[in-house]
């Protein structure tokens, strides 16, 4: 199959089996002012919960536009928004989407381009947006198809009190071998404390977000430059064996069902000594109203094995489906949600550590933010700047992406393999079998690109 046709057809693989047609927005002409209601679908992360709290008393009062939010867990969100956008359902006027989806959906004509509005509004200051984030949301035509709400890499978080109690010192650039040693010394199941929390929940963007960075730094890859699959290669296997073994020995309770949200709660409640995950978690951990470990957490670069850095690159961004009939109102919301003024609002109303950072250069010059985020801001920005979607490992890659492969089929492939790896964590299968099955699935994908 020609590559262009393969990509277009493979977009359908993002859909889950048995999806039904979505409803409509109720029609009506576009309206950017009072009396208008727009629908927003977003992932249930803390930053999105914050915007839900702030919208009515601020955005709606200023514009007269009401926003009806639907919040879903990450995996459910991905299924729901993919179904609606791909099927042209028109149920949502705006939605949070990630760096993986945006270039693919832009190619398929499913999203409005936002560069025109962003560049026309001088107060929005599009030039202030961090270049890695804008690049990850740009289509083949060079236009931006989603506006970054917050950006992130990944790093290692650790409980400083627990380390001090054991006389341990965390290096700024730890290796995975050091992390495993720390986990063994800090794990205390008798007191309900795990040595480390790592995602075990199936999902290409759940379990395989951290795991693929481990694969990269162990010298592995999903595909070589010529699309040769390497899912059961020694390096991929060694990384997965290490990850699964680390969780089984020293990980959190219920690890096969633990994703970002569950690990945030576990670590934030002081029930884990370390957590390797998104840099965006730091704001919540440093909020004393949301975390029991505020002021007790240290932040260091993503653990490595054979590479110098291994953090991922991701942004949750606001996109506007082509099917919306309320594009003007939708852009007003998107521009507000991703503006400097919104960051200031969050800082003043909810606390500066909760600002949705990682998207604007100016954020890191705000005195109040720098003070509240001093424990993690430098490592966060350094991690974002060192993330390399073009060359995240030890060999050339056929597609962009650090913790994912930037092709439509990866959502289905990554999720299927993650289900088997999660089962290995649960003890119902082996890593070798999981990756042998994954290799066969990857071979089927590779046929589209040979």
Task: For every predicted segment, state its role.
Residues 1-38, 61, 432-436, 440-450:
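Short, low-complexity disordered leader/linker segments with a strong preference
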Residues 58-129, 165-167, 266, 270-275, ...:
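Extracytoplasmic "Venus flytrap"/periplasmic binding protein-like
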Residues 66, 164, 378, 388-450:
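Conserved C-terminal helix/tail region of periplasmic/extracytoplasmic solute-binding proteins
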Residues 99-153, 207-210, 294-303, 384-388, ...:
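Hinge/lid segment of periplasmic solute-binding proteins
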Residues 115-129, 172, 200-201, 218-238, ...:
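Short, solvent-exposed loop/beta-turn-alpha elements that line the ligand-binding surface or hinge
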Residues 119, 280-293, 306-415:
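C-terminal lobe and pocket-closing loops
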Residues 140-149, 154, 177-229, 263-265, ...:
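Extracytoplasmic/periplasmic solute-binding protein
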Residues 182-187, 225-257, 298, 302:
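Glycine-centered hinge/linker elements that transmit conformational signals in sensory
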């Amino acid at each position: 199959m020609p590559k262009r046709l393969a990509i277009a057809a493979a977009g359908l693989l993002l859909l889950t089996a048995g999806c039904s047609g979505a409803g409509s927005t109720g029609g009506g002409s576009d309206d950017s002012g009072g009396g208008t209601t727009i629908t927003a679908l977003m992932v249930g992360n803390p930053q999105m919960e914050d915007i839900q709290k702030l919208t009515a008393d601020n955005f709606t009062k200023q514009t007269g536009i009401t926003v009806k939010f639907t919040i879903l867990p990450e995996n459910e969100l991905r299924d729901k928004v993919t179904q609606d956008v791909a099927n042209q359902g028109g149920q949502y006027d705006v939605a949070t989407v990630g760096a993986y989806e945006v270039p693919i959906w832009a190619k398929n004509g499913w999203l409005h381009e936002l560069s025109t509005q962003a560049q026309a509004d001088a107060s929005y200051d599009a030039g202030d947006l961090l270049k890695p984030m804008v690049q990850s949301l740009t289509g083949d035509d060079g236009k931006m198809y989603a506006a970054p709400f917050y950006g992130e890499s990944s790093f290692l978080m650790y409980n400083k009190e627990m380390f001090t109690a054991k006389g341990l010192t965390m290096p700024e650039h730890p290796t995975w071998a050091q992390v495993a040693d720390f986990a063994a010394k800090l794990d205390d199941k008798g007191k309900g404390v795990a040595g480390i929390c790592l995602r075990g929940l199936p999902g290409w963007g759940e379990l395989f977000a951290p795991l693929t960075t481990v694969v990269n730094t162990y010298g592995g890859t999903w595909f070589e430059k010529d699309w040769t699959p390497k899912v059961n290669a020694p390096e991929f296997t060694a990384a997965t064996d290490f990850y699964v073994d680390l969780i089984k020995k020293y990980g959190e309770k219920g690890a096969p069902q633990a994703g970002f949200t569950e690990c945030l709660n576990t670590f934030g409640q002081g029930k884990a000594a370390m957590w390797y995950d998104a840099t965006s978690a730091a704001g919540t951990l440093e909020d004393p109203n949301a975390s029991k470990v505020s002021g007790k957490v240290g932040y260091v670069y993503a653990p490595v094995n054979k590479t110098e850095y291994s953090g991922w690159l991701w942004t949750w961004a606001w996109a506007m489906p082509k099917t919306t009939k309320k594009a003007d109102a939708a852009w007003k919301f998107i521009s507000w949600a991703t503006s400097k003024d919104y960051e200031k609002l969050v800082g003043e109303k909810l606390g500066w550590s909760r600002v949705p950072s990682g998207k604007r250069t100016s954020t890191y010059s705000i005195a109040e933010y720098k003070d509240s985020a001093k424990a993690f801001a430098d490592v966060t920005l350094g991690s974002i700047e060192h993330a390399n979607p073009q060359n995240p490992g030890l060999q050339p890659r056929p597609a962009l992406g650090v913790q994912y492969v930037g092709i439509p089929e990866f959502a289905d492939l990554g999720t299927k393999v993650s289900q088997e790896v999660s089962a290995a964590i649960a003890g119902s299968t082996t890593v070798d079998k999981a990756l042998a099955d994954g290799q066969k699935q990857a071979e089927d994908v590779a046929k589209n690109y040979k």
